[in-house]
Amino acid sequence: MLRQLLLVALGGALGSAMRYLTAILLARHYTGSIPLATLVVNVLGCFLIGLLIGLCNDTAHLRLLFITGFCGGFTTFSTFTAESYAMLREGAYGLAILYIVGSVLIGLLALWVGVYLSRIIAP
């Protein structure tokens, strides 16, 4: 149990650090209305989970490290929800709906692409 917990913690720490770095890099180059950093990390996280589902499905310790840990730390549903709420509170209803629906649909597509690619890489 301790080994599994350490794998999740290590992956989560790395994923959280990567999310933070991604947000910093994107903030330097983007100042638009859509919270791009959250959208990017969530879509990339969905893609990675899709890819890793196929590549790590039979290996419990890799699933814990990469899917539960890294992707769990890298993606952020709570920030997505808070940003959506802020848009709604500010009256930006169209932007909020676009962000919410777009995030979910693009995330599902990214996950599907990841699963598809995993089947090509490791049939």
Can you describe what each PLM-predicted range is?
Residues M1-P123:
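Membrane-interface helix-loop junctions in multi-pass transporters/channels
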